[in-house]
Structures are given as C-alpha cells and as structure tokens.
C-alpha cells in the first residue's frame, strides 16, 4: 500500500472519528484521532505537515508539503502534470524522500507551529525557524524545507 493511499485512508478515518462514526478501542482506553493523526503548518503558510499512524508497513510517518519555491529542485524530479509540488516523506527510522505529489496535506486550519517552537510526536521532531522547517526521526534522518534551501540528511 503506498504512502499516498495510506494518507488518504487516514484522512478519511479522521473525518469519521470527528463525526463520531468510528471508534478504535485499545486494551484499556479508546484511541483518539490525536493519537493517530496530527497536522501543523509553518507561519509562512508555505509548508504543511501531517503525521499519520496506520496499520500498513509505514506504521508511523510524517509528510510535509512545500507549496511553492522549493530550491533546489530534487535532482532528477520531473513531476507529472497535475502534481501539486514536492513533498518530504519520512517514516520513523528510514531516510527521507522528496516524491512528487498529486495530493496535498494542505490545511489552513492546521495548528501553526510558531517560529522557534518544536513539535514532537511518535519519534519525530520538527523545529520551526524563520529560515525553514527541520524534521528528523529516531534514526536522526530527516529533511529541511524552505524556499531558499531544501535537503535531506
């Protein structure tokens, strides 16, 4: 199952949870959508991120979309028509990738991660700075996104 499909399924599940139509029980308490899905955005409204926990092989992952101006363009990327831009994807222990994306995690209502603040969840850490967004996983792999510089590490 691709990460994109998993993300689409997770978004649908969160919508159902919000409507009270879906409940996922654990041994002693009910999991909430906050445990399985979270979103945040940069104050510039140019980077939007989604954290997803699923039962797929990509059990926990983070995806961030840069809406415009990624530099340099990831080498060899020729996105197909209809692509909305470049995303940064990473699972909890692997290396980050910069795939082309035909969907987006854009959500203007997502929590704003103010400059100088850090977001942590499920083995991921993201630091918001005026210079851009830096996210890493448990293996210390990650990515940096900004209009001026974007890279994986």
Which functions belong to the PLM regions below?
Residues 9-18:
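Bacterial N-terminal signal peptides
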Residues 127-153:
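Extracellular glycan/ECM-engagement signal in secreted proteins
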Residues 17-32:
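C-terminal region of N-terminal signal peptides and the immediate post-cleavage residues
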Residues 35-46, 116-121, 125:
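Extracellular glycan-recognition/adhesion modules and their associated mucin-like linkers
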Residues 29-31, 61-113, 145-153:
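A low-complexity, Ser/Thr/Gly/Pro-enriched, surface-exposed linker/loop concept
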Residues 1-9:
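Bacterial N-terminal signal peptides that target proteins for export
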Residues 43-72:
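Short, surface-exposed binding/anchoring microloops in extracellular/periplasmic proteins
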Residues 101-134:
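Acidic, glycine-rich flexible loop segments
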């Amino acid at each position: 199952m691709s990460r994109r499909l998993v993300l689409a399924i997770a978004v649908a599940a969160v919508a159902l949870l919000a409507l009270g139509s879906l409940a996922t029980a654990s041994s002693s308490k009910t999991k909430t959508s906050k445990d399985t899905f979270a979103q945040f955005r940069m104050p510039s409204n140019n980077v939007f991120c989604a954290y997803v926990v699923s039962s797929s092989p990509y059990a926990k992952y983070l995806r961030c979309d840069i809406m415009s101006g990624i530099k340099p363009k990831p080498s060899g990327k020729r996105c197909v028509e209809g692509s909305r831009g470049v995303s940064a994807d990473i699972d909890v222990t692997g290396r980050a990738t910069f795939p082309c994306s035909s969907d987006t995690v854009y959500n203007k209502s997502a929590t704003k991660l103010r400059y100088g603040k850090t977001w942590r969840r499920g083995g991921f850490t993201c630091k918001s700075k005026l210079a851009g967004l830096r996210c890493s996983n448990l293996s210390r792999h990650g990515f940096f996104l900004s209009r001026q510089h974007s890279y994986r590490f």
